[in-house]
């Protein structure tokens, strides 16, 4: 079977696959690797449901690619919008071959507190947990996949204790990239927790590092000082088609059928932050997150 590398693109990963009759959900489809994931899956015959902060943004993205796509509004900064998106997706009355948690923000200069948490934990982790747990029943029995776009920042930037549970709103101090790192660790730990929960249904869950992609919409939230480093970081970056490769690999390639609870980079298994393998850490993250959602998210 073909081996893919950091240079592989999403289209190369899907080159020999016919995805006709398959359904995929991609969050954050308006730009960057989310848009490329939407485009590549649709180009290979899949029906792709794409979410964005507004219906207009989702529709623009879907209209920009050939193939069968459906736009859905889902502002992950707002739990009410996420719950509305759940209802809209359920109304489609389809089963999904994969749900791809791609939407995210990175290192805004201010914490932007809402629901008692800063924006990165809210947008990147909590809203995905809300969306995925309420839609997990729509994943195909025996073959469905959950794919969470995490990051190497889960290892490189997350605090040594994993998540600052006593400082989720940043009131004890806010370092943008530290909070970004913990939100990406939360994505990884959530995927591992879901792998355990979904195993009995024959559904797999994995997380990934897409690579450093500087031409993505993710950098829109960066502060001025952080932007000064973009040209340097860009020297080590991937193209958007390369950045979407591992996502498409985990979502659709037969090589990873049945493999669950993993962390991948460059379409290969990678070493995760050790906290993600700690069952007690994952349980605490789940319990704290579930409590926040129970308090602030509307009922189904």
What positions do the PLM features span?
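A generic structural signal for short coil/turn motifs at secondary-structure boundaries
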Residues: 109, 272-275
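Amphipathic terminal alpha-helices
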Residues: 280-300
